[in-house]
From Swiss-Prot:
SMART domains: COG6 (SM01087). It is found in: Golgi apparatus membrane. Acts as a component of the peripheral membrane COG complex that is involved in intra-Golgi protein trafficking. COG is located at the cis-Golgi, and regulates tethering of retrograde intra-Golgi vesicles and possibly a number of other membrane trafficking events. It comes from Ajellomyces capsulatus (strain NAm1 / WU24). Keywords: Golgi apparatus, Membrane, Protein transport, Transport. GO terms for biological process: intra-Golgi vesicle-mediated transport; protein transport. One of its GO terms (cellular component) is Golgi transport complex. Signal peptide: none annotated. Its main location: Golgi. This is Conserved oligomeric Golgi complex subunit 6. Belongs to the COG6 family. InterPro entries: COG6, COG6_C, COG6_N. It is a peripheral membrane protein.
Amino acid sequence: MARSCKILAKLPRVGTAISNLTNVCEEMRRHIVLATQETAPLFEEAAILMSQQQEVETKEKILDAFNNHFILSEDELSSLTSSAKPVDDLFFDALARMKQIHKDCEVLLGSENQRLGLDIMEQSSKNLNGAFQKLYKWIQKEFKSLNLEDPQISLSIRRALRVLAERPSLFHNCLDSFADAREYTLSDSFHTALTDVPSGQERDMAARPIEFSAHDPLRYVGDMLAWVHSAAVSEREALEALFIGDEGEIAKGIQAGVNNEPWSRVDGEEIVFDGPKALNDLVTRDLNGVTRSLRQRVELVLQGNEDSIVIYKIIGLLAFYENTFSKLLGRESGLVTSVASLQEFAFKHFQILMQDQLAVVSAEPANLTPPADLSTPQFLHDALDNLTSLMKAYDSSFAHEHANDSSGENKFSPIIREALDPFLELAKTSSNDISDPTSRAVFHVNCLLSTRDAISPYPFVCVTHLPQLTNTLKTLRTTLLEIQHEFLLNASGLHILLTALKPFTPPATATLEPTRSSYPPDLATISSLPEFQPQTLSSISQQLDDFLPSALVDVTENLKAIHSPVLVKSVTEEAVEAFCTDFEFVEGMILGADEARGKLVVHGDGEDVGAEEAGEGEGEEPQADNWRLRSLFPRTTGEIRVLLS
């Protein structure tokens, strides 16, 4: 109870304390409200500032990223455009960044702020142009001291060339300068090789200037061509390492440059860079000076030489190197064209030499007079000797080939037409001046036989000329056969009887219904012919008997001037056979005539006796018409064959 009283006594004080606390809270609330009212603008401003700070920070990051991507540092710009700075890795890195910046400007041009993109693109274009100009000048400077013979060509210049290829105009200008420099260098080296002994401690003491062999045209031309070939191979290998290596990076650069410069295309055609062709063109340009000097010297050598064999060997040498240079540099190369034109020049000179030789022979009548023994004339012998040397040279040369078409034409065909055909024609003309047909045919045959013997070992000549020679020889052989046959008939007197018996010769063709006047005529009339009168027939028979013992020797002697015993023997044998056939015909006509006159009776023992006696007694004279042709012309075909065998 007492405790309750104490609690009740303290309640007023608790109420007072609570009231005071309430007042304090109210006061504090009032102060808080006032403070809140006073600080609210500050908080709002702070929030705005914080938001702005975030925006600024974001923009700062964007700006930093933009600057890092689109803006080069001062060092990079200086390395890119300053001529005082070297072309090193920093330059190429800066150039790569600048090209990327220029490409990425396309993104800016697609945004709302195109002005920024245009400004940056304009500035990057200026920087790129300055960088490529710096690179172009640096490459030209390096080219002046570049040693292509050094197997370790600077990697930096190879890298620079690949980068410069993205500017085709600058790249080609650079190549022009390079080609001019190399042309001068190679021309100077060629002149040195021609006239000066190589210097240096390790020089070959046996080495001599090329012009030391100028007295030997073939070696002189060969040494010059060999030097040019060696220089072309070395130049191509060096330039291939310089321009074509690294998997065609230069080609890719040029293609990229062409794609970036569509206005440089002709008629809108797609331009594709051909690396090997460009390399061949560059090597050709480098050798232009050497090519001109080579052409001049070879032409002088050709003009000053009158040996057709040497000229032809030079033609073969030029043909070999034309093929070699074609494989190395392509058919369109100026060097190949020059060597081909030198071949044409040499062949024209060869033609002139052949024409001069022909003119010299034709100008002297004694040269055209056939020899007394009807042998091959000296001018044709000389021409065949010359041709043999030419054929041997071709047979052992690189140009030797099989016939390239159905006509058998080959690379030697133009040569033989100049070196042989005119002289054969001249020999034929000379033979036409011989009045005697036999001598004319023998002389012509000897000329053709000598020609055939000369060309027979060489198939590439036989294929074009042997058929014609063979046909002509066949024609002449027929002529010789007729001559030998005619000789046998004339020498034996048999031609008189054959001429008289011509009406009794069987016709080549017979009509289906022969008339009384047609073949065969009455054989009994043969004895009335003047040629078959006793005195004439006996004279012819005696002439035949006088001729037969030496007939074979005489008829062979008729063609003794021919240089082919085999030909003489075969022609004579055929002529003898034809003579025997003619004699057999005459013999048959004589027997037929005697039988037709009733003057020949053939007994069982084979001996011929008269059907009528000349008279009743032995001492009586025969009647004028009681004679037999057979008794006046007793030779038989069998006897003739034996005597002429």
